[in-house]
A protein has these predicted regions:
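Active-site-proximal alpha-helix that buttresses catalytic centers in soluble enzyme cores
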Residues: 1-296
Length: 296
């Protein structure tokens, strides 16, 4: 792609004051897009972190940047994409002209892009390599019962599209807080293999703790050698010693270990648990696509 010397990309996301992993995927995708040199500038802004959405209005020099493409790194349309982001960035529609002459174009959220289906299939294959889809149930997990129900609708849409492909024995959209419940996966599925993919932008409390507890793997361990079980990443948190930064790194490793212990053997079946879909490197491609679509 040709470098647009007068155009910039702004990726906006929720962020978190308590979960440092919340902004990590957004920052990683921004770094990758910056490396590709498609835009003259690539920045990120957050609702709950710095730089803030409100400050993002001043990130780009109007003398150098004439057009800013804003891409919401959210899984679906909802309260934040429809209300918070436009309010904080002072946007009055899909296209906003600033008094300084800059044109700001606001795209649909990344979760609306057709490539989401492809990424979900890719992640399901990666987390369960060599496992036959015909003998596997794929569960796409969303929150359910939230400020806006669109995330549940988006999960249902993706499940329907993957189901129509006829690749997996069963494809279900399931939820943490409303039926069909992810905690009922044993009743909902009959296959020997089950793949669970959290339909979230980043990993955090839901993917590290809540969903594992709901599906019964928070205390389960796959068959692995004693040598591996003694690895730092799987030690109880109380065993960590050293500096605060080192402890934080260790805690991050311990949280991420839940994704590396596949498969979980439960009731004679194999359960494979994936990281949140928003951590997939392919999101950078979707962000670029959404930005280019917003510019057209």
């Amino acid at each position: 792609m040709t470098l647009r010397t007068d155009a910039a990309l702004l990726i906006v996301a929720h962020g978190s004051t308590v979960n440092p992993d919340s902004s990590a995927p957004t920052l990683a995708h921004a770094a990758e897009i910056r490396r590709r040199e498609i835009f003259a500038g690539v920045e990120s802004a957050f609702w709950k972190e710095e730089p803030s959405l409100r400050d993002a209005i001043f990130l780009f020099d109007p003398e150098l940047i004439r057009e800013v493409c804003v891409v919401p790194n959210f899984i679906s349309e909802g309260y934040f994409t429809q209300t918070v982001v436009p309010r904080e960035l002072d946007l009055n529609g899909r296209v906003t002209k600033r008094p300084n002459g800059q044109i700001w174009k606001y795209s649909e959220p990344v979760g609306n892009h057709p490539m989401m289906t492809e990424l979900l299939l890719k992640r399901a294959c990666e987390v369960a390599p060599g496992v036959s889809p015909g003998e596997t149930s794929l569960l796409i997990v969303a929150h359910g019962t939230d400020l806006n129900e669109n995330s549940a609708v988006a999960a249902k849409r993706e499940a329907e599209q993957i189901r129509a492909l006829g690749k997996y024995a069963t494809v279900l959209n399931v939820y943490m807080e409303e039926p069909p419940l992810v905690s009922d996966w044993r009743k909902l599925t009959k296959t020997r293999n089950v793949v669970v993919v959290p339909f979230f932008i980043s990993d955090g409390l839901h993917s590290y703790e809540d969903i594992p507890r709901l599906i019964g793997i928070s205390r389960s361990h796959p068959e692995r050698s004693e040598a591996k079980s003694k690895d730092l990443a799987v030690k109880p948190l109380g065993n960590f010693t050293g500096s605060l930064d080192s402890a934080r790194d260790d805690i991050g490793l311990a949280r991420g270990e839940v994704f590396r212990r596949n498969p979980y053997k439960i009731g004679g079946r194999s359960l494979f648990y994936a990281p949140s879909i928003g951590t997939d490197a392919g999101f950078a491609d979707i962000i670029v696509e959404q930005a280019l679509n917003a510019k057209s």
